[in-house]
Regions:
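Conserved N-terminal phosphate-binding loop of PLP-dependent enzymes in the Aspartate aminotransferase
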Residues: 5-431
């Protein structure tokens, strides 16, 4: 009876009840928009009160294929009824076929499967150091990796050691040695540091998403890759947020590639080590991956790196289907076309409102800059107003609002959302 009573109470909880539960029992390491979501389909969400919203965050670009995509959830359920986890102590019948599929899909020799994005980043950093010692001949304990200022690669101690964001870094020292930070989008600064013979790698986000959707100058990534090649340094691309069709290409480092899911070109911005995550599973389970060619990946030997859950059969079945959806539904092309529509509408808004000063982005990874100080709460207040009007987005770095809907959003839905954003901002009054 007691269990039945608890169940009955839970089904009648309201928004305020859920907020109170998280506040009382959860760590206070997040500051969410005050909406409690209960259901999703495609680009749409519904809260516990039944109110409808359009999703314009996509779980930080993890839900590129849309919420609860039927093909992906079918793959999840089908595999979950057979086998979910074996660890890597044994082979399973999903991993090998998935590895073949994903390496051919992105055009690399080998893949190392992990779970979360930051796990994949750490894996790439370890692999880079290993290569530096074994292949480049760097003296033990001296390997360096160059990062770009404004980066966001996750929350672990290793990667926050290269962060310049006080919120991510303060009070978490001592920090990991062997990192050098140079300004983003500054080829000359990179050129000055990369000549150091102890540098093993350069890790770059093709577009800095968390920093506010900063798009580098045309040719920047090609120059980075060229410098890496000239100095025998590995180019590491963190495409956890930008990859898998989000920016209008399969990868943001693809340049003009139109492979639509079967990369055969050794393009001029091709990463030596590619990091993927988030949308690799369509937002269903944590799946990430590190891809590289044999000369790099085979530096790792059994026992030197691993993950209990990495490469599990459930993740492999889901990820393979999620990538098939990207290819079959031509989500790269959709993101490219709809992104142009969105930015054009936001440019019109800039002409109408002094509150918005800039729109930037690629594909369906975009942001608007609010005309206020970075430490102001204006962008937050606008996002709350957007929520009240049926659209969910989140500010980043105070005065920037990131807009990244699922790539399955229709042109009709996108136009409705642009209307919501426009009307909300035109009617917004600073408190």
């Amino acid at each position: 009876n007691q269990k039945m009573e608890v169940s009955t109470v839970q089904t009648h909880l309201h928004t305020a009840d859920y907020l109170q539960l998280e506040d009382q029992y959860g760590a206070h390491n997040y500051h969410p928009i005050p909406v409690v979501l209960a259901r999703g389909k495609g680009a749409e969400l519904w809260d516990v009160e039944g109110k409808h919203y359009f999703d314009f965050l996509s779980a930080y670009s993890a839900v590129n294929q849309g919420h609860c995509h039927p093909r992906i959830t079918e793959a999840l359920v089908e595999q979950a009824q057979k086998l979910t986890l074996t660890s890597r102590a044994f082979y399973n019948d999903q991993l090998g076929p998935y590895e073949k599929f994903v390496t051919e899909y992105f055009g690399y020799d080998k893949v190392l499967p992990m779970n979360t994005g930051v796990e994949a980043v750490e894996t790439a950093l370890k692999l880079c150091r290993k290569w530096g010692y074994q292949k480049k001949g760097i003296e033990q304990g001296r390997a360096k990796i160059i990062f770009a200022s404004g980066n966001f690669h996750g929350r672990t101690l290793a990667v926050i050691s290269a962060s310049v964001d006080p919120a991510a870094r303060n009070d978490f020292g001592p920090y990991m040695p062997g990192y050098v930070v140079v300004p983003y989008n500054d080829v000359e600064a990179l050129a000055a540091q990369i000549k150091d013979p102890d540098v093993a790698g350069v890790i770059i986000e093709p577009i800095q998403g968390e920093a506010g959707v900063f798009v580098p100058d045309e040719g920047y990534l090609a120059d980075v890759k060229k410098l890496c090649t000239q100095n025998n340094v590995l180019f590491i691309a963190d495409e956890v947020q930008t990859g898998i069709a989000r920016t209008g290409k399969l990868l943001a480092t693809c340049g003009n590639c139109t492979c639509a899911g079967h990369c055969e070109n050794k393009y001029e911005t091709r990463a030596d080590i590619l990091i993927l995550g988030k949308a690799l599973s369509g937002g269903v389970v944590p799946v990430s991956a590190v891809l590289a060619d044999d000369e790099i990946m085979m530096c790792l030997k059994p026992g030197e790196h691993g993950s209990t859950f990495g490469g599990n059969p459930l993740a492999c079945a889901v990820a393979k289907t999620a990538l098939e959806v990207v290819r079959d539904e031509q989500l790269s092309e959709r993101a490219e076309e709809l992104g142009k529509v969105f930015r054009e509408r936001m440019q019109q808004l800039i002409a109408q409102s002094p509150l918005v000063t800039l729109v930037r982005g690629k594909g369906l990874l975009n942001a608007i800059v609010i005309n206020d100080e970075e430490d102001s709460h204006t962008a937050w207040d606008i996002c709350v107003a957007l929520m009240q009007n049926g659209l969910l987005a989140k500010p980043t770095h105070g005065n920037i609002i990131r807009f990244a809907p699922p790539l399955v959003i229709t042109i009709e839905q996108l136009e409705i959302c642009c209307n919501i954003i426009t009307e909300t901002i035109l009617n917004f009054k600073k408190s």
